[in-house]
């Protein structure tokens, strides 16, 4: 799909706010009569023929930079005030009503900001209208100012217009959302959405439930348990959760459905906030190692890694690859990913049209100073020599060895060797990070022989390294772990699961040297990434997967002890990972993984009892394991056409106190909590002696968690 850069409109107004000039800014040579800008000009301002100007306002400018640019564009040397009828720009009222310098009111506090245009004007990528007035023509001339134009901005804009005709803006946005947003969608909006689902008659299952903290409502087609008070859930025809909202957070799996539902109804939902990741595929490859030859800090900030850029406000990160661009945005801004892709493609055309290859030693020496560096007691940086010593043994076409020296010859014929004056770091090896990323063979000096390393085999013997080989470096817990990585467990679980186990690490880093067995975190369990956002999602996953799940400092079990499998999962940034035992020999980089010692956690399972009837009547039996009708477990889907709110049962202080230690550590499935509430309520109303409540509870739930705590 070809990205069309939207036209922009600049309106210069006089004393009566009459339009003196209407500038239609576009990188094209014509007016797009189908654009919203032209419709606004013709229908609302009754302007049929604006001035067509082949220029473009960069949406990355600050307000002061924008003011200087507009003064240059309109050739105004006086103080000016800029504003818009859609969004506040330079000034805003404390209550966020739209500022207009011709109808100023002193009853509200006026705020001035110098933020970035795309932040204060969220729809700027598609529809940008800026009004400009001389300050002396308004009711508040003291609020006007004059800013000099930044010549670098004009220089960049000129180059942008020159290369624009040759840009290939054919792009495809593959993934648009990371599924989690922050908004102010409340009960009114949620009710309107669920009403729309029923009006469309699309046979999607929907559920709107409201409840107090820690209790259960059984409505619709699912048991729902969240710690939030309000929840809307809608399932696709195949039973997949399409979207879910708790009134503050919206999780969207079916973007089209969500867009269709809210497109023409007033949900009272303000601007959505939350991290969003876009992956944009390019029809024409670019140079991912971008180099900016002029000042462009008003657009991007360069980082130490030459394929990563940051926006000027550092809230948007851009990772460049040859055929695609990944863009991570803090808050949702319509089409911002396409706009930044346009800028990246343009800059590539300006400065990086020819991709050059060069020897690492001549171009990327910065990496040696950071990763393979010489210090007072370590001499790890290899030196370049001009010849081989007589009698050196040929190991391969690019590697020679003697008792005193090892020599590596790269593709450009440059010879590297290690000659540590202290006699320690004399073994030639290679930096894994560059080999993994780019297949670069960057030599470095090591204490021990490196010939057993997989990277050595690839660089010296041209033996293909398995793509999914796991790095021996163990990351700190907290980040999502990829297939080639592993990380430590959280401190509390590391101490618990690895009691009596050891892992020997190399000095001064987190590289695993040797272990006969140690619990760590591996990448996502299974082939597909599983994301769990709410407590309800977590409980549903645990009972379907039938394995233990660690979330923060809590452990989730399947409902029944007999269901507990032999795996341990752990949630990191809402992604399910796997806990494994790692084993490694000191003489090899090969890492072996084994199942965890799941029994350590299984022994903490709180409900270890046989099925016991609590009460029965007319073929219905309530037991500690579920609710049965005529001997069959009741698990039928209920109708989702109606919304039902059930009054929650509140347990007595004695019961709450009894179970409180348990729920600090372990929470089981929604049905379990529902049945506990029901069961306790029945017991309390069965003429049980108040002085005998705890012994009665211990009969059905002998392991309350107190034994584990003590």
Curated annotation (Swiss-Prot):
Its main location: virion. Disulfide bonds: none annotated. InterPro entries: Poxvirus_early-TF_lsu (IPR007532). The keyword Ribonucleoprotein does not apply. The keyword Transcription regulation applies. GO terms for molecular function: DNA binding. Acts with RNA polymerase to initiate transcription from early gene promoters. Is recruited by the RPO-associated protein of 94 kDa RAP94/OPG109 to form the early transcription complex, which also contains the core RNA polymerase. ETF heterodimer binds to early gene promoters. Belongs to the poxviridae VETF large subunit family. This is Early transcription factor 82 kDa subunit. It comes from Vaccinia virus (strain Western Reserve).
């Amino acid at each position: 799909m070809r990205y069309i850069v939207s036209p922009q409109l600049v309106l210069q107004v006089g004393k009566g706010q009459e339009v003196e000039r209407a500038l239609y800014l576009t990188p094209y040579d014509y007016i797009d009569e189908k654009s919203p800008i032209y419709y606004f000009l013709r229908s609302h301002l009754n302007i049929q023929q604006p001035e067509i100007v082949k220029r473009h306002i960069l949406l990355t400018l600050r307000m002061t930079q924008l003011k200087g640019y507009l003064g240059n564009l309109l050739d105004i040397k006086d103080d000016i005030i800029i504003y818009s009828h859609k969004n506040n720009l330079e000034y805003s009222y404390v209550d966020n009503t739209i500022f207009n310098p011709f109808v100023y009111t002193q009853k509200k506090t006026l705020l001035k900001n110098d933020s970035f245009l795309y932040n204060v004007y969220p729809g700027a990528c598609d529809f940008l209208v800026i009004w400009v007035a001389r300050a002396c023509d308004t009711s508040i001339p003291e609020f006007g100012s004059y800013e000099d134009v930044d010549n670098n901005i004009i220089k960049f804009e000129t180059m942008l217009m020159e290369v624009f005709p040759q840009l290939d803006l054919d792009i495809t946005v593959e993934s648009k959302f990371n599924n989690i947003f922050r908004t102010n969608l409340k009960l009114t909006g949620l009710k309107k959405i669920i009403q729309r689902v029923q009006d469309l008659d699309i046979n999607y299952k929907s559920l709107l439930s409201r409840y107090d903290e820690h209790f259960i409502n059984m409505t619709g087609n699912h048991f729902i348990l969240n710690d939030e008070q309000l929840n809307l859930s809608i399932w696709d025809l195949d039973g997949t959760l399409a979207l879910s909202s708790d009134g503050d957070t919206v999780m969207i799996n079916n973007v089209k459905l969500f867009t269709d539902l809210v497109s023409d109804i007033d949900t009272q939902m303000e601007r959505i906030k939350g991290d969003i990741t876009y992956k944009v595929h390019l029809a024409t490859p670019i140079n991912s190692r971008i180099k900016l030859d002029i000042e462009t800090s008003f657009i991007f900030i360069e980082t130490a890694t030459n394929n990563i850029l940051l926006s000027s406000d550092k809230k948007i990160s851009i990772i460049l690859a040859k055929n695609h661009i990944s863009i991570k945005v803090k808050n949702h801004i319509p089409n911002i990913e396409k706009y930044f892709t346009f800028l990246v493609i343009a800059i590539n055309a300006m400065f990086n049209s020819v991709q050059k290859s060069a020897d690492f030693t001549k171009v990327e020496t910065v990496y040696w100073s950071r990763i393979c560096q010489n210090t007072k007691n370590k001499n790890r940086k290899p030196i370049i020599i001009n010849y081989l010593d007589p009698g050196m043994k040929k190991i391969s076409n690019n590697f020679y060895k003697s008792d005193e020296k090892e020599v590596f010859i790269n593709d450009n014929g440059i010879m590297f060797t290690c000659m540590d004056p202290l006699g320690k770091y004399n073994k030639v090896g290679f930096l894994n990070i560059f080999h993994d990323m780019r297949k670069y063979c960057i030599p470095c000096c090591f204490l021990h022989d490196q010939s057993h390393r997989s990277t050595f085999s690839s660089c010296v013997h041209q033996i293909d390294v398995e793509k999914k080989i796991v790095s021996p470096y163990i990351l700190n817990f907290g980040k999502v772990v990829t297939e080639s990585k592993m990380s430590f467990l959280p401190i509390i679980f590391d101490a618990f699961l690895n009691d009596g186990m050891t892992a020997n690490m190399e000095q001064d880093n987190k590289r695993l040297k040797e272990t006969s067995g140690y619990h760590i975190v591996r990448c996502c369990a299974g082939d597909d990434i599983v994301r769990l956002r709410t407590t309800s999602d977590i409980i549903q996953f645990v009972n379907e997967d039938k394995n233990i799940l660690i979330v923060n400092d809590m452990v989730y079990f399947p409902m029944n002890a007999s269901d507990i499998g032999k795996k341990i999962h752990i949630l990191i940034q809402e992604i399910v990972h796997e806990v494994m035992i790692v084993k490694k020999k000191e003489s090899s980089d090969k890492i072996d993984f084994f199942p965890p010692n799941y029994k350590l956690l299984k022994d903490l399972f709180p409900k270890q009892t046989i099925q016991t009837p609590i009460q029965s009547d007319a073929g219905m039996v309530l037991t500690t394991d579920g609710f049965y009708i005529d001997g069959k477990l009741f698990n039928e889907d209920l109708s989702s056409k109606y919304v039902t709110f059930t009054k929650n049962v509140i347990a007595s202080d004695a019961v709450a106190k009894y179970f409180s230690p348990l729920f600090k550590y372990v929470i089981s499935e929604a049905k379990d909590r529902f049945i506990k509430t029901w069961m306790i309520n029945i017991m309390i109303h069965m003429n049980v002696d108040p002085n005998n409540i705890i012994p009665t509870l211990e009969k059905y739930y002998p392991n309350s968690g107190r034994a584990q705590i003590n």
